[in-house]
């Protein structure tokens, strides 16, 4: 098995390279907050020497309640993304939900994300593939790791091989997610870069009356476990006031903890990738 390397400017994304951070906020709440969060991430990752891609959503189309905040929408969201890109010289990742969104988003954003709940929607997959952008595929909570090959094949047949696979937990009974660490290793056997969404994996789907709950207190433990696998990247969301975040606050890392958190993750990644591989199949 050979590891595929995806190049994004000077950033190399691969399972055998130093990990890349995909981080930011869940949803764009305001221009000012997005700029504050992007600046904090940029400063911390530059200090620690971690390759970094800023993440946020312009629309959360799968909220538990019709009354929940969804975001500023695509037009306003892309303006904010462009300002972040220009101000901090950061590459960007965001998710799309409809085929018509793919091309305009790809004109601003570097990596387009396929949401877990939509990962089998062929029309969306094809529209994303045709942009030529790098694609981050969130593994659906209801799919086995080996079934990701079908989604990969769809993208390949639509002409796109620039694919990242992202683990974000699997359904375990009602209102609960668990992370199968061996499943991430199984996805790595594809050769494609695998990243770990360590904050969404903390979700308790439908765990509150009209929104998802979460286990923010365990954010460090879960991420440490994932980083021990030697992954291409870590995906996290942070907020200066998680208890009052407009989406997924119960899973968000407190922004003031970002440097301490990433210092530990980098140390684990550096250590694991310094080891020689051991083939225990023989």
Curated annotation (Swiss-Prot):
SUPFAM superfamilies: Aldolase
BP-aspect Gene Ontology terms: keto-3-deoxy-D-manno-octulosonic acid biosynthetic process
Pathway: Carbohydrate biosynthesis; 3-deoxy-D-manno-octulosonate biosynthesis; 3-deoxy-D-manno-octulosonate from D-ribulose 5-phosphate: step 2/3; Bacterial outer membrane biogenesis; lipopolysaccharide biosynthesis
Claim: rRNA-binding is one of the keywords in the record: no
EC number: 2.5.1.55
Reactions catalysed, as given in the entry: D-arabinose 5-phosphate + phosphoenolpyruvate + H2O = 3-deoxy-alpha-D-manno-2-octulosonate-8-phosphate + phosphate
Sequence intervals crossing the membrane: none
Keyword Transferase in annotation: yes
Protein name: 2-dehydro-3-deoxyphosphooctonate aldolase
Species this protein is from: Shewanella loihica (strain ATCC BAA-1088 / PV-4)
Name of the gene: kdsA
């Amino acid at each position: 098995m050979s590891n595929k390397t995806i190049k994004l400017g000077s950033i190399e994304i691969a399972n055998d390279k130093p990990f890349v951070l995909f981080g930011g906020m869940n949803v764009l709440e305001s221009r000012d907050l997005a700029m504050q969060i992007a600046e904090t991430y940029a400063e911390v990752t530059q200090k620690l020497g971690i390759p970094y891609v800023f993440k946020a959503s312009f629309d959360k189309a799968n909220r538990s309640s019709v009354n929940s905040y969804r975001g500023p929408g695509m037009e306003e969201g892309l303006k904010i993304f462009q300002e972040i890109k220009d101000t901090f010289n950061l590459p960007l990742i965001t998710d799309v939900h409809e085929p018509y969104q793919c091309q305009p988003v790809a004109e601003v954003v570097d990596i387009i994300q396929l949401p877990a709940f939509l990962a089998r929607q062929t029309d969306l997959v094809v529209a994303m593939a045709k942009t030529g952008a790098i694609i981050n595929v969130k593994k659906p909570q209801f799919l086995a790791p080996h079934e990701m090959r079908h989604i990969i094949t769809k993208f390949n047949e639509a002409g796109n091989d620039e694919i990242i696979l992202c683990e974000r937990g699997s359904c375990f009974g009602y209102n609960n997610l668990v992370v199968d660490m061996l499943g991430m290793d199984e996805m790595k056997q594809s050769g494609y870069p695998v990243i770990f969404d360590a904050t969404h994996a903390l979700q308790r789907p439908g765990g509150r009356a009209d929104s998802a709950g979460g286990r923010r207190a365990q954010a460090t433990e879960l991420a440490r476990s994932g980083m021990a696998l030697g992954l291409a990247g870590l995906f996290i969301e942070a907020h200066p006031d998680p208890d009052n975040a407009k989406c997924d606050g119960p899973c968000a890392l407190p922004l003031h903890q970002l440097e301490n958190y990433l210092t530990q993750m980098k140390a684990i990644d550096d250590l694991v990738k310094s080891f020689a591989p051991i083939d225990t199949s023989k």
